[in-house]
């Protein structure tokens, strides 16, 4: 498991960047580089359920480990969800990475926002994450600065 970090400075206040990150419409825009048609469904509760899903309804089962809007959110990934809605949090494949974190930290940077993202991941996904976050953060910047 490795930790990858990404950062961008956005000429917008933290709340605006937060809203672009997690608004249903804009979330799909910046996450399209991971998988077109991505959605996030969450009860927004620490210890509750959050799902990161592709256009077919399959994806990751996660929970919110820490939530301090608009400063930070930390997701802990627990398992997989297939397109039929079956959760897998127990298989050997899932247990190899279950418990890894994905962190979004928004720092006030003189009226701008420094968005810092950290994601724990298997080495085999590094190129996919680098491509997705590099392009995705640019979309977040564009949306937050122009909405």
Predicted regions and their residues:
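Short beta->alpha connector loops
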Residues: 32-33, 55-58, 122
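Short, surface-exposed coil-to-beta transition loops
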Residues: 3-5, 58-62, 98-102
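Beta-strand/loop substructures that line and gate deep hydrophobic ligand-binding cavities in soluble
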Residues: 77, 82-134, 147
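Hydrophobic pocket/interface hotspot
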Residues: 17-21, 27, 50, 64, ...
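Glycine-rich portal/gate segments that line the openings of hydrophobic small-molecule binding cavities
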Residues: 38-88
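Structured surface interface patches that mediate subunit assembly and partner/cofactor docking
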Residues: 33-36, 120-121, 135-147
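A short, structured loop/turn motif at beta-sheet edges
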Residues: 10-15, 65-73, 105-114, 142-146
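Hydrophobic ligand-binding cavity/cleft-lining segments
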Residues: 1-38
């Amino acid at each position: 498991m490795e930790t990858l970090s990404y950062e961008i400075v956005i000429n917008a206040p933290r709340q605006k960047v937060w809203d672009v990150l997690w608004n249903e419409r804009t979330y799909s825009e910046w996450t399209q580089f991971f998988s077109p048609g991505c959605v996030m469904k969450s009860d927004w509760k620490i210890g509750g359920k959050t799902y990161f899903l592709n256009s077919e309804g399959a994806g990751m089962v996660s929970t919110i480990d820490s939530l301090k809007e608009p400063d930070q959110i930390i997701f802990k990934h627990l398992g997989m969800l297939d397109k039929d809605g079956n959760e897998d949090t127990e298989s050997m494949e899932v247990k190899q990475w279950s418990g890894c974190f994905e962190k979004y930290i928004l720092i006030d940077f003189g009226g701008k926002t420094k968005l810092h993202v950290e994601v724990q991941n298997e080495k085999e996904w590094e190129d996919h994450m680098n491509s997705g976050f590099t392009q995705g953060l640019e979309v977040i910047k564009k949306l937050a600065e122009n909405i």
